Amino acid sequence: MLKGSNQDGSFYIDCRMYLYIHPDNPQPRNIKTVVECLQDGGVIIYPTDTIYGLGCDIFKYKAVERICRIKNVDPLKAQLSFVCSDLSDLSKYTRSIGTPLYRLLKSYLPGPYTFILTASKLVPKILKSKKNTIGLRIPDNKICQTIVKEFGNPLLSASLPGEMVEEYTDPESIKDKFSALVDIIIDGGPGGMVASTVVDCTSEEPVLLRMGAGAWEES
């Protein structure tokens, strides 16, 4: 990795690389490399329990903007989600969770779900929708969970641009297409082809917005 300085005097780490991380036993040294990259405002591509996604520190505004440029979307209209390490972490970024909702979240997480919840004041404005909501995830993926826990901040979760999802199951294909656009591409084995199931929990009853990889039975 090469360290340099920006025009404003801040430092950055040039950590552009293709990094293999074992899906069941993530190597601490490689996790540390990813964490250092995120701390310095880097953008990564990482595995989840569904499809591979773009990620960065949610508190690094320029990194979030960079991901939006890669996806060619307006940051204020992108409806981006982010990954938390556990329910305790998730509760910091949403308003008070009542017992029924907590039980619901606990029964489905970790898992291939994105829950739309009312955002707390800790959520950066760039990530909030006009309705003051945010999509939150806790993927059932060891690499993703380890990165978020070691990093200490939530990780932005954004799908890769384009409609050819089958191309994004192979990390090598991802590298061929995106290596010049991001800082680290993590090879955590083959990815999935189906995105997460999205459920809106901002009303009294949960509402299914998108059926994805996670099973869901509406009451």
Predicted regions and their residues:
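Active-site-adjacent structural elements in enzyme catalytic cores
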Residues: 14-219
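N-terminal amphipathic/basic-hydrophobic helices that include classical n-h-c signal peptides
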Residues: 1-16
